[in-house]
Amino acid sequence: MCPPNTPPGRAATATADDTEFRTLLDRLSDKATADYYNPFTTFDWPATIPTDELWMSPELLSLHGTELMDELSTAQLQALSRWESVNFYSLNVHGIRELLIEVTRRVHTPGFELPSEFFHHFIGEENDHMWFFATFCLKYAGKIYPDKSVKLPEAPRDPDIENFLVFARILVFEQIVDHYNVQLAADRRLHPTVRHINRLHHQDESRHIAFGCRLVHLLWERLLDRGLDEAARHELRGYLGRYLTTSIESLYNPAAYRDAGLPDGFALRRRLLAHPARQAAHAKVLHKTTGFLNRIGVFDDHR
């Protein structure tokens, strides 16, 4: 998670000359080297994962906390857990693809001289993650759900603002995913393969999140240092707020409901997204992210 008292950096030269950032990067790079694993030899993929058991913790399902959850039979619960797990890993595949594109565009470019060495660890690990999530989906479900997320308007064509929004989006994505990884890795009701991929992903993402928190703060300080006006700040808040919303909504996939045998998936999605219990669940998933963005001044309590 992000440090509770992330200190401000020297905005204009934050990514090029920041002693604390350099120390963090060295520590994270050393840890990445020490924790390195070959994903192609690490996993002992079983031929199948039984369909008459849970693939995802019931507490993480999109129906949890609603009266609809209580109406599910054991078989329906198992089916929903299977297809919502496939949706979750599919979202990882699509999200990782996008972040790899954005980070690769910036490695060894002006302004990112200092973090570029860590970017190589980051890119390699994320490529591994995309491979094992895709392998899980294809091997045990026969498909990856297509990316149906709502595309946000283009970010403002200002390099500093674009850089900030890119890494803020990456941080949001990683923290949402990590919320699930931690619980799935610890849930003894789940198949060992499910727990294993989530444990390894969390192990790597803990470094990526520590890096992302510091970089996002430094890029935000850069924007403030150059004199970000209130209109631009309002636009940034709105953009990130919409990204938080669309990220959460992507966890509610009508195709997963259909595959689980639940009727009228689009109506079910609308009903669930409006349900008070699900609103509370969303706040729980996002609390680290919104807390961090509030703490550094991107969000405020009145956004």
Role assignments for model-derived ranges:
Residues 211-227:
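Soluble, non-transmembrane catalytic domains of enzymes that act on hydrophobic metabolites at membranes
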Residues 107-108, 185-186, 217-220:
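A structural signal for long alpha-helical coiled-coils and helix-turn connectors
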Residues 92-100, 122-137, 167-178, 201-216:
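Alpha-helical transition-metal enzyme core signature, strongest for iron centers
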Residues 1-116, 139-150, 160, 164, ...:
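Terminal targeting/low-complexity segments that flank the catalytic cores of oxidoreductases
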Residues 135-204, 230-245:
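Active-site-proximal alpha-helical scaffolds that flank and shape metal-associated catalytic sites
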Residues 119:
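Active-site-proximal, substrate-binding regions of enzyme catalytic domains
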